[in-house]
């Protein structure tokens, strides 16, 4: 407010002067030239005095303000003295700390200078992560703070000694540098130690990569397993494709399906045996057996491929023994392993086969039992009997294999659990087939109802197979089984 008032006064004092000058100036310029010169001089002198007076007035105000400040100088001096007494310590401390930090910063910040002195140390420090630099800086700052505190105490006690101490850290700077270099050596060792986990980290990365490779290996193993799955299928096909033993194994399967398996196909199997055993089964030699087996393999393969086309059941059931090739092979090998037992049991089967042969004339003549069995099929569907008879004419193995996988799917477990009991069970069935025939015919009828149209298509697909199969099968039924 004072400034505003002063400015207003200045304006009021200044504004009338030019008006006066303007008013009087034409007079001076005009007629009153000579007189007015003196007046002009007087007025100029007055204006100059006013200006000087105003200037002096302003200076006096300024001086008054300075005087008020000067009057308080004593108290301010006391405050300034106390502040100066308090302030020089942090200022001196700051100067000392800055002097101490300057060489240390020169030492810590440029690692290139360290490389000049310690090239062997600097080379790992180049690889040192930034965190370790920060840790080193923190440690150096800790030492600097301790050193600065020591210097502060010395400054407070002896200002002259502080200068010596200030000069001494410059003198001691190589020692500090050596200490810091030792710390840096230790830090480099630490960094090397940290580099070692970094070096170990490639090992971990290798382990991770190995693990990543292992899933690839696992994938390869899975792929191998997937490759093994076709190998399993191939192995499942191999015992069907291999010439003598595997075909005999399939003959064992056929024989077991005819003789050992306690299923409703067994009486039909016996019907097949009774139909085919009188068809000169004894005229075949072992060589004919081997030739017929090898010749019968290819139609078997076709037949194995074709029951997949028959129905979903047969496809699933034919797939099951392929998914269980080793199990079936083990089950096939099991009767080989207790060969003496099987030989001991096979005479029984021969005896029963004799009984079968005793029954076969009735079966050729369609004895009442078997004829009752077959009309049971005819009662269900006359086409079924025709189809089954055509299948018996074309390939009995087709008939064995089409429901055979059902037998395998259900009976392999029975063979796993009780491989030996499979042999006496058919004796019970041969002794009393009529007791189990109704269930047998019901299940056979179910199988036959599931397959009628597709079974019709099968004999059309296999026109040229029947002779070979008729040659191959009867040997595979009884005699190959007896030979084992």
From Swiss-Prot:
Biased composition (Basic residues): 61-79
GO CC terms of this entry: nucleoplasm
Keyword field contains DNA-binding: no
Cellular location(s): Nucleus
GO biological process: cell differentiation; regulation of osteoblast differentiation
Highest taxon of the lineage: Eukaryota
Tissue: Expressed in hematopoietic precursor cells, thyroid and spermatids (at protein level). Expressed in bone marrow, testis, thymus. Expressed in prostate cancer and ovarian cancer. Also expressed in thymus and thyroid tumors, non-Hodgkin lymphoma, various leukemia cell lines, peripheral blood mononuclear cells (PBMCs) and bone marrow mononuclear cells (BMMCs) of patients with leukemia.
Induction (free text): Down-regulated during megakaryocytic differentiation of K562 cells by 12-O-tetradecanoylphorbol-13-acetate (TPA) (at protein level). Up-regulated in normal PBMCs by mitogens.
Stretch list, region Necessary for nuclear localization: 7-87
Post-translational modification Phosphoserine, affected residues: 123, 159, 181, 188, 201, 349, 353, 363, 367
InterPro entries documented for this protein: Hemogen
Biased composition (Basic and acidic residues): 1-25, 306-320, 413-428, 438-447, 454-463
Signal among keywords: no
Residue ranges of the region described as Disordered: 1-32, 44-91, 265-290, 306-369, 386-471
Described function: Regulates the proliferation and differentiation of hematopoietic cells. Overexpression block the TPA-induced megakaryocytic differentiation in the K562 cell model. May also prevent cell apoptosis through the activation of the nuclear factor-kappa B (NF-kB).
Protein name, entry field: Hemogen
Species this protein is from: Homo sapiens (Human)
């Amino acid at each position: 407010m004072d400034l505003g008032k002063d400015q207003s006064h200045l304006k009021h004092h200044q504004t009338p002067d030019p008006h006066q000058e303007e008013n009087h100036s034409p007079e001076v310029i005009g007629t009153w030239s000579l007189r007015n010169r003196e007046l002009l001089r007087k007025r100029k002198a007055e204006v100059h005095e006013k200006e000087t007076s105003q200037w002096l007035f302003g200076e006096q105000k300024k001086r008054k303000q300075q005087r008020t400040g000067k009057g308080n100088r004593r108290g301010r001096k006391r405050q300034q003295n106390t502040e100066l007494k308090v302030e020089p310590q942090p200022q001196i401390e700051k100067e000392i700390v800055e002097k101490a930090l300057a060489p240390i910063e020169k030492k810590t910040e440029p690692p290139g200078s360290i490389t000049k002195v310690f090239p062997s140390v600097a080379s790992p420090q180049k690889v040192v992560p930034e965190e370790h630099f920060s840790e080193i800086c923190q440690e150096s700052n800790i030492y600097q703070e301790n050193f600065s505190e020591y210097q502060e105490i010395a400054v407070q006690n002896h200002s002259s000694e502080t200068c010596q101490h200030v000069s001494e850290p410059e003198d001691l700077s190589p020692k500090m540098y050596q200490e810091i270099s030792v710390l840096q050596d230790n830090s480099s060792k630490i960094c090397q130690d940290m580099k070692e986990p970094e070096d170990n980290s490639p090992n971990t990365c290798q382990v991770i990569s190995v693990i990543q490779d292992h899933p690839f290996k696992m994938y390869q193993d899975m792929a191998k397993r997937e490759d093994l799955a076709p190998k399993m299928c191939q192995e499942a096909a191999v015992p069907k494709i291999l010439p003598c033993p595997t075909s005999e194994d399939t003959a064992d399967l056929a024989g077991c399906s005819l003789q050992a398996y306690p299923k409703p196909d067994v009486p039909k199997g016996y019907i097949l045996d009774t139909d085919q055993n009188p068809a000169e089964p004894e005229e075949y030699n072992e060589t004919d057996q081997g030739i017929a087996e090898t010749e019968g393999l290819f139609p078997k393969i076709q037949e194995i491929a074709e029951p997949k086309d028959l129905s979903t059941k047969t496809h699933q059931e034919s797939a099951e023994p392929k998914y269980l090739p080793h199990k079936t092979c083990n089950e096939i090998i099991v009767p080989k392993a207790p060969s003496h037992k099987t030989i001991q049991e096979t005479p029984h089967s021969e005896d029963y086969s004799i009984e079968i042969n005793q029954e076969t004339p009735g079966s050729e003549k369609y004895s009442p039992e078997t004829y009752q069995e077959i009309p049971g099929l005819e009662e269900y569907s006359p086409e079924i009997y025709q189809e089954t008879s055509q299948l018996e004419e074309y390939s009995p193995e087709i008939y064995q294999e089409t429901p055979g996988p059902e037998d395998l799917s259900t009976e392999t477990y029975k063979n796993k659990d009780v491989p030996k009991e499979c042999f006496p069970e058919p004796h019970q069935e041969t002794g009393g087939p009529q007791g189990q025939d109704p269930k047998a015919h019901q299940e056979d009828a179910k199988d036959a109802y599931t397959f009628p149209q597709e079974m019709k298509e099968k004999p059309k697909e296999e026109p040229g197979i029947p002779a070979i199969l008729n040659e191959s099968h009867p040997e595979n039924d009884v005699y190959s089984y007896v030979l084992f």
